[in-house]
Amino acid sequence: TINQTPSAPTAGASPNPICSGNALTLTASGQSGATFTWTSTVTSGLITGSTAVGAGNINDVLTNSGTTTGTVTYSITAAGGTLGCPGPTVNYIFTVDPIPNVSNATLTQTICTGNNASFIPTSNVLNTTFTWTATGSSANVTGYTAAGAGTIGDVLTNSGTAVETVTYVITPTGPAPNNCVGTPVNFVVTVNPAPTVNAVASQTLCNGSATAAINFVSATAGANFSWTNDTPSIGLGASGADSVPSFTAINNTNAPITATITISPTANACAGP
């Protein structure tokens, strides 16, 4: 009796290519009574999770820890009948795409109100694309785009007195045809307000009179103040910081002198009006 050689096996499988971390299911079939054995070999890339030797169906979870596409070759051999005559071996090559990431080292930015929030996302996987959504910490921060793709470039305004933030949630997606989706990351922009200074009343004095000291107040926490005096001959220096001290007003002319003191508030490296 000469047993026949089984026909070449065929296999129905899950989608190919697959994304890293996904399950691969391969079901071999052939003529009635045939059994199947197989081996697997990583033929390119940094692929783990493939079972080296097995029989019957293939159920592996394949992981690509690299940044480029990898492949695993499954070699399936059929044996037929009670005597198990070996048949031909058929190779099935599975492609495993890596999961892209957002590889930027810095995911925060601090700006002053009215300035540009700028971020160019990069990835470990070539030809990755990026989509994002944005939310503000309160209604006082405006100017951000609610959803977009690619580079972020919004001019952000903080109309309040407290520090506000805008959080961009960026999602990387690998190239077609598999379009593997990576883990979203947050890019957080801190938007400092422009500090203000309280209104200061003008003073009218006689020559030789003492002025009232001027103390500045801002609604923005941590504000500092500098000032300049355009007429130092009145007895006050040309510039100073924080408050304006009391001084003796001087006018050695025959006409009134008007001096203008200009106050410049700053907070968190942002200048106010």
Q: What do the predicted segments below correspond to?
A:
Residues 1-273:
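Extracellular low-complexity Ser/Thr/Asn/Gly-rich intrinsically disordered segments
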